[in-house]
Amino acid sequence: MNKLLELKNVSLTYQTLNDEIKAIENLSFNCNDGEFLSIIGPSGCGKTTVLSLIAGLLTPSSGKILIDGKSVGSNIALGYMLQKDQLFPWRTIEKNIYLPLEIKGINTKENKEYALYLLEKYKLIDFRKSYPDQLSGGMRQRVALIRTLVFKPKILLLDEPFSALDAQTRLSVCDDVYKIIKAEEKTAILVTHDISEAISMSDKIVVLTNRPAQVKSIYRPILKGDSPIRKRESKDFGLFFEKIWKELV
């Protein structure tokens, strides 16, 4: 598989009035095309900061971040899915999904048809004229994912996208999001505090240290099952959980 994302000795230092704070130090890892990679680590270690660097929202103090061999910011399409769905309450589901197309100036008939195709494919077409407050939390997150997919990004950046959901809904939506991402053959980078979530969804897991964040270890969980819920039933699931738990305590 081709390396789609590469971080090479990336460091980030914040300047304050009285001090210099190292947030990230010599961080290196890669993600292949089509992989689902999770970033996990202690609270406050800089996981979301890493996503911001990949997205080009922050500039590293040193090191390189390459997407498809090009520097971040080279007009490479990235999709960002946040903790909250960020759906506009005054717009219908259909109009919410068209929003990225409008912002990017690519609101063409072809792209709008693709948006409706995604709604149809993932069984949300009957809700296209509904408003966000008429949908459950899980359905809203599915809509948010489709909105992220509609402009065909190379990489999806997922920042704790399930954290606002209750436990039962979280498992179900996690399963749905995983299946959609795999069906669309997308590369995904997930930031999560949930070890089980990382193990069940990921082809690769990057474990970070406390700040300044460095790569502590990398895991490739190979589990039986075609979905996160099924993978949680694998006999090796507990072994990976114990190993990663020990890395974090």
Stretches found by the model and what they are:
Residues I40-P42:
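The feature captures the beta-strand-to-loop junction immediately N-terminal to the Walker
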Residues A55:
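Helix-to-loop junction immediately C-terminal to a conserved catalytic motif
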Residues G63-S74:
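Conserved ABC transporter NBD signature motif
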Residues E94-E102, K112, R220:
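Short helical segment in ABC ATPase nucleotide-binding domains corresponding to the A-loop/adjacent helical element
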Residues E102, K109-F127, K179:
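Conserved ABC ATPase "signature" region
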Residues Y131-L135, M139:
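Conserved ABC ATPase signature
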Residues V150-K154:
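A short, proline-enriched helix->beta-strand linker immediately N-terminal to the Walker B motif
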